[in-house]
Design a protein with these regions (language model features):
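A short beta-strand-turn-helix
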Residues: 33-53
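N-proximal helix/coil linker or "cap" segments that precede and/or mark the start of modular domains
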Residues: 5, 9-31, 48, 170-173, ...
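Short pre-active-site segment immediately N-terminal to redox-active cysteine/selenocysteine motifs
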Residues: 51-53, 58-61, 129
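Thiol-/selenol-based redox modules, centered on thioredoxin-like
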Residues: 135-181
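Short, internal strand/loop/helix patches
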Residues: 103-138
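Hydrophobic beta-strand anchors of alpha/beta hydrolase catalytic cores
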Residues: 54-55, 86, 133
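Conserved redox-active cysteine motifs that mediate thiol-disulfide chemistry
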Residues: 57-74
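Thiol-based oxidoreductase modules, predominantly thioredoxin-like and allied folds used
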Residues: 83-97, 109-118
C-alpha cells in the first residue's frame, strides 16, 4: 500500500515538473513599453488583451516590408471585428521619424505604429531579418513567427490568421443563424 502511494506521489510530482518545463519554454511578448509615432508610451502586453495581435517589424529602407504592409493593413481592417489587429513596429532612428510619419499617413494605414529604434524588442522576439512578423494570442503568448516577404506569402499569412480566429468566426456564424430563425 505504501509503495502504491509513493508511486502516485512520484507521478504527480513528475507531471508538475514536466508541465512547468513546458510553460517556461513558451515564448511571450516582452513586457515592455514602446512609444508610438506621436511619442505616447504603449505597453505591448496591453495591446494583446482580448486580441490576436500581429506585430510587424520594418524600416523605411526595407522595400519588401512596404509591400507586405499593404496586405497587413487589409488584414487589420478585414479581421478587426474578430478580435485581430496589426501593430506595426518601426525600427528607423528617431531622426527619421518625420519620414516614417509621412509614409504612414500617405499610405493611409489604419493600424497603430510603434517605435523600436534600438531594435531591442525585435531582438528579444528573435528577429534577425526584416520584415519580421510575430503573432501573439490574448495572453501575449507567441503562436507564430514569419521572417522575410515574397509575393504570395500574404496568402499563407491570411490562412494562419483565419485559422487562429476560426473559433470566433464559427461562433459568430452560429449566432447569426440563431437570429435568422
Amino acid at each position: 500500500m505504501c509503495q502504491v502511494y509513493r508511486v502516485k506521489i512520484y507521478l504527480f510530482i513528475s507531471t508538475l515538473l514536466f508541465s512547468s518545463d513546458v510553460i517556461e519554454n513558451k515564448e511571450f511578448i516582452p513586457d515592455v513599453r514602446l512609444k508610438d509615432i506621436n511619442k505616447k508610451k504603449v505597453k505591448l502586453l496591453d495591446l494583446c488583451k482580448d486580441y490576436y495581435v500581429l506585430f510587424n517589424f520594418w524600416n523605411m529602407a526595407c522595400e519588401p516590408c512596404k509591400k507586405e504592409m499593404k496586405f497587413l493593413n487589409q488584414f487589420h481592417e478585414k479581421y478587426n471585428s474578430y478580435n485581430f489587429k496589426v501593430i506595426s513596429i518601426n525600427m528607423d532612428s528617431p531622426r527619421s521619424m518625420s519620414k516614417v510619419k509621412k509614409y504612414v499617413k500617405s499610405s493611409k494605414y489604419s493600424f497603430e505604429v510603434l517605435q523600436d529604434p534600438r531594435m531591442d524588442v525585435f531582438k528579444k522576439m528573435g528577429g534577425s531579418i526584416m520584415p519580421f512578423v510575430v503573432i501573439a494570442d490574448s495572453s501575449g503568448s507567441i503562436v507564430n513567427k514569419h521572417i522575410g516577404y515574397n509575393l504570395g506569402d500574404e496568402k499563407a499569412l491570411e490562412e494562419e490568421i483565419k485559422r487562429l480566429i476560426s473559433f470566433k468566426i464559427d461562433t459568430t456564424k452560429i449566432d447569426a443563424m440563431k437570429n435568422d430563425k
